[in-house]
Amino acid sequence: MQYCIISESLKLAGHSKGNHGYGGIWGGRNATYHHNLIAHHDSRNPRFDHSYVGHGWRGPIDFVNNVIYDWGSNSTYGGETDSESNVFHVNMMGNYYKAGPSTKSNVRNRMMELTSYCTNCISTGFAATGKFYLKDNLINGNTADWGKVDSEHSSKETRDKASLKEGAKLAERWTTGLTELKTIESAQNAYNNVLTYAGASLVRDAVDKRIVQEVKDGTGGLIDKVSDNMEKYFPTLAPGTPITDTDKDGMDDNWERKEIAKLGASVGIEELKPLSYNISNRYTNLEIYMNELVVNTFPDAANANSTR
């Protein structure tokens, strides 16, 4: 998961549990989360999943070169473990944490809160923190090492917190050979690149532009309901110019004619179907078309950071 903007979850919007402005629960096996912008969430910035949810999905996770801004009551936490053979492993490298107007004073310098206690873990007779490798993270412009990690998330945990923290440390990056990025930027460079390129759009809309500017300016905050300010949180977007798509296959006629010319007379427009492999043996025609739409969106340096 890369270059996404995850922003402004709704804090008081009628959830049965009350306050629920949360960023997300991130987990998986051999999963990489890099160059994402997480902004304006009360908690779960993100929350790493618990290993008891699925023993086959306990990591490792690379959490690399992300930007986390304006957490409210908590920043990153989670990754609790329910057995010695089911340990959750997370590599946190080159991430940039920046407190905002909503960040409570007691957590302004908290990069992460360790989590060991959970009801499901206790029921198995074993509960421990995950294992974390920390390197080159920043929080509010300062080095974010283990001194910026608190323990424990649950008030029900009665074990020695210093021992829990010591047991959570990994001396080296946990690897399986499957998830590593070839290039890991400094946290400062990642901050600049995320604010420049993040967002699932060729053109940023008013909301994405506002979120990025708020990160730069140190402004904005948590919201309760979109209806509190529809113009700001859910603006009407002006329609763009649609493509000409005579055969209604999702691909621009001009692009199809260009590709047919390259292929020669052996392929007609009716044969250049979205799910066919006329242009490549590896990618469908539609995949190639969609890739060409965004091929110039990122500079080569940013593309290199996305390559495994």
Annotate each language-model stretch with its function.
Residues 3, 34-35, 212, 252, ...:
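Non-transmembrane alpha-helical segments in soluble domains
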Residues 50, 78-80, 94, 99, ...:
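Active-site proximal loops enriched in glycine and acidic residues that flank catalytic Cys/His/Asp
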